[in-house]
Amino acid sequence: MRSLGLFLALGLGLSLTGNAQARDLFEGRFTTTDPISGVTQSASAGRNNVLDFADLFTDAGLKSTLSGYTPISAATASVSLRGVPATLSYAANSPVLRLQIPSIGIDRSFNGATRDQSQDLAVEWLRGGGGAELTRFLKEAVATTPVDPVAGNPNSLMSQMGASDFNVATGGGFTAGGRSDVAGGGRFDLGARFGRYTADGFDTNVYTLPLGYSYGLNNGMRLIIDAPLTLLSTSGAQSYSGSVGVGLRIPISVNLPESLSWALIPMMRAGGVGSVELGAVGGLWSASLTSALDWRAREGTTFTLANMASRLETMSVTISDFGISYDLTNYMFRNGLIATQRLGELAGRQVSGSLFAVDTRFTGDDLYVKAYQEYGGYLTFGDPVTVAGMRVPIRLGATFTQGDNGYRGFSANLGFTF
């Protein structure tokens, strides 16, 4: 219990001491030069909505940022597009908007009859008209920034789909604690998780509603259905994601000692994520296999060793005018250890405490966070907690996360099984 208190205190500290002024997702330094007088003016501006930021490149938007701007002035902006450096510019006396992203060799001109029309063409490029060039930009964002909702960081859909397979395969022990397996019949799992994460000046709050169901079959196997829903808020820009996974927990009997139990859990999963504010949308499918080995070292003490390998691949998705392909294929390897100790009773309820550590690593396409670690603890309050006459184990947990490029965060969890 003391260890869990330390995790909670650390999480509160992270929540209260996050960046006072988090970075804007889209920001730039704007400069204009009058073609007649030669006078130059500069200003900075940022937005957390891709369309609002794009509006800064209309005549009205540039005028609001640079009072000396005219429709024939030269205008240049060194910008950060979700962390990817780029340059957008108008030459003097020209309506053509030029986009340059040196890191991936993109140099694209949008030639409208007016600057406002050129800006419209640039927006269409971002909505999916960019084709292969847009895919290169998205892959660069995943590889070099911590805020893409599809992939590249521990809170992206790709990472969360793999983590969900791993967590349900171990009975939720690495998130909210406690194995919900029973000999037969059906059990529902309901939980809530809040997390706060920071990297490279960006802050992200994560709200997750894990939903699950499992059913014990007569042959000792157990059918698993898992459907978590997640809301991410990064610098005020919101992303919504969800996935559905189906798996089978298969007990393995190979003349193991009575103190050992082993199961293999294959799972298939599909999910999607979208954010109008970020201009991002994507879908993924995955297939995973998890091994879970329990060792009852002594009465009241159990160690669980879990190992997972998963293949995750993006799918093209078109939603609300955004047609986007990330073209990513990655392999996720997740390995963890739980130590669980029965602590006794509290108000007539059986209580156990656990500590865990998990290491996650990716291969395949380049990601901003290729490896991260999670350390946590949880308490399980078991029977005889009852709700509406049903026995309902309750789980409280906390997790600290650290990863590549200074990625760090904290989450707190609450879970029920009934």
Task: Describe the residue ranges of each PLM region.
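Sec/Tat signal peptide C-region and signal peptidase I cleavage site
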Residues: 16-22
